[in-house]
Amino acid sequence: MSVEQAPVQRADFDQVMVPNYSPAAFIPVRGEGSRVWDQSGRELIDFAGGIAVNALGHCHPALVKALTEQANTLWHVSNVFTNEPALRLAHKLVDATFADRAFFCNSGAESNEAAFKLARRVAHDRFGPQKHEIIATVNSFHGRTLFTVSVGGQPKYSDGFGPKITGISHVPYNDLEALKAQISDKTCAVVIEPIQGESGVVPADKAYLEGARKLCDEHNALLIFDEVQTGVGRTGSLYAYQHYGVIPDILTSAKSLGGGFPIGAMLTTTELAKHLAVGTHGTTYGGNPLGCAVACAVLDVVNTPETLAGIKAKHERFKTRLEQIGQQYNLFSQVRGVGLLLGCVLTEAWKGKAKDVLNAAEKEGVMVLQAGPDVVRFAPSLVVEDADIDEGLDRFERAVATLTKG
């Protein structure tokens, strides 16, 4: 029996939702590939990807098939039992990475929460309670739980909620000397995003990551890579650590892993995983059959030589055109990033106006993101068609031309 749904509009958000978001004026109602349609039937090209989540675009046939088949089979059993999709997904991830063990949850924040708890637990078990300090970077972003905002180096997200988690310090990103000065035998973990996504799409220097690995080894600290945004093909490698050739002790993954379905994962070694014994950590929904079935399908499509090579080629297509647009209209001083995570840094004349660029782009029918007030971010589908790239950037250029005319 179908139930007729009451019509809703954007204005309803302001009446019934907690106001912690400020969504766009239009409501997307349908998506296919890299295209989205709103309530009025207007079509937009999606270069935002649900903030680097929709790895295969909208309603990819392989994901629809995986979700539909699993939805007709088994939804949820809790972690009192395991399930087949979770075990298949764990095998796929450990076979493709440095890791031996996987922990599944529902989001990037939960993945990082698990990683930070594991790091402290390992240090506690091996060295005692005095070894509990975590070093993160300024302007990092690791999630919105109290622990993850405390580790994240952005006061705008962590201030105003009472005492933060203690034992956490922050050093400038890509500054190995600052890390060297801060790390000590009390450090249990160093947490790094291989590319700082929310803070401007800033890639790490290879020497910085190599140096961090060496310092962690010298001080018996664990190296955690937060790959929530960079993982699952986003950089043209399955995970960014493979792009850099630096192996962490713990890796976190989410966003693209589910291709739009909520799932997170923490990956680590057998030796470290044993410290999370029965009862030390958990999540009711983590590793549910639906999410794991979809994630298996995502990996089957993304983790192929053809798809990963295509991401690198599409990077060049985006970057070349964005640099041309930036130069022609004096809008971007730099286009940076790896794979299909690109950040366009606004010139001095346009500093602080990333949201204006987003709004102008939306009016021309293209969805993009910002990464702070000074950077326009692109995180499209990893399998976006070249024709969609070209048409989307044509629309984006029209938006820029209109905006810069004033």
Swiss-Prot record:
Pathway: Amino-acid biosynthesis; L-arginine biosynthesis; N(2)-acetyl-L-ornithine from L-glutamate: step 4/4. It is an enzyme of class 2 (transferase). Its cofactor is pyridoxal 5'-phosphate. Its EC number is 2.6.1.11. Keywords: Amino-acid biosynthesis, Aminotransferase, Arginine biosynthesis, Cytoplasm, Pyridoxal phosphate, Transferase. It comes from the Bacteria. It is found in: Cytoplasm. InterPro entries: Ac/SucOrn_transaminase_bac, AcOrn/SuccOrn_fam, Aminotrans_3, Aminotrans_3_PPA_site, Class-III_PLP-dep_AT, PyrdxlP-dep_Trfase, PyrdxlP-dep_Trfase_major, PyrdxlP-dep_Trfase_small. Gene3D superfamilies: Aspartate Aminotransferase, domain 1, Type I PLP-dependent aspartate aminotransferase-like (Major domain). This is Acetylornithine aminotransferase. It comes from Pseudomonas putida (strain ATCC 47054 / DSM 6125 / CFBP 8728 / NCIMB 11950 / KT2440).
